[in-house]
Amino acid sequence: MESGSGLLVRRIREGTVIDHIPAGRALTVLKILGITGREGARIAVVMNVESRKLGRKDIVKIEGRHLSPEEVDKIALVAPRATINIIHDYRVVAKRRVTVPDIVEGILMCPNPSCITRVGREPVKPRFRVVSRQPLVLQCVYCGTLVSEEDVAEQLAEGG
């Protein structure tokens, strides 16, 4: 990425670039990926840069790592318009938009304290269906409670 005075962040040789993250959500993406900065891998986080599509956006570059499908699904919940770029020898060899899965299971907790998934006696995984993708709204299949994109991002940022 370039600015009027040159590159803001160096290109990476091998790894993953997550682009078009909503402004302010890059740190949540790092949390989802379990990245603390102590792993030794080179990580670049750019926040609140100009974007034609989003107005402002965040970008995360991770050298030497590719994402699992489960990680991509989680990222889609907090950044539904993100793109995942796979980098090999400084070049983008694959580019893919994330897609919010139709069913989200075992990732989030239902916020309803009376939901069967919250009662300790029942070993039921929380399960949500997508009601809306833009803006993201999920609905618990057991109790019908609606969960907004902001609530999802908050849960995932807390490690939930």
Curated annotation (Swiss-Prot):
Record lineage: Archaea, Thermoproteota, Thermoprotei, Desulfurococcales, Pyrodictiaceae
GO MF term list: metal ion binding
Signal peptide: none
Biological-process GO terms, alphabetical: 'de novo' pyrimidine nucleobase biosynthetic process; pyrimidine nucleotide biosynthetic process
Keywords, alphabetical: Metal-binding, Pyrimidine biosynthesis, Zinc
Family annotation (Pfam families): PyrI, PyrI_C
PANTHER family: ASPARTATE CARBAMOYLTRANSFERASE REGULATORY CHAIN
Subunit structure of this chain's protein: Contains catalytic and regulatory chains.
Biological function: Involved in allosteric regulation of aspartate carbamoyltransferase.
Protein name: Aspartate carbamoyltransferase regulatory chain
Similarity field: Belongs to the PyrI family.
Cofactor binding notes: Binds 1 zinc ion per subunit.
InterPro entries: Asp_carbamoyltransf_reg_N (IPR020545), Asp_carbamoylTrfase_reg (IPR002801), Asp_carbamoyltrfase_reg_C (IPR020542), Asp_carbatrfase_reg_C_sf (IPR036792), Asp_carbatrfase_reg_N_sf (IPR036793)
Amino-acid positions noted as binding Zn(2+) in the UniProt annotation, renumbered to this chain: 110, 115, 140, 143
Species name: Hyperthermus butylicus (strain DSM 5456 / JCM 9403 / PLM1-5)
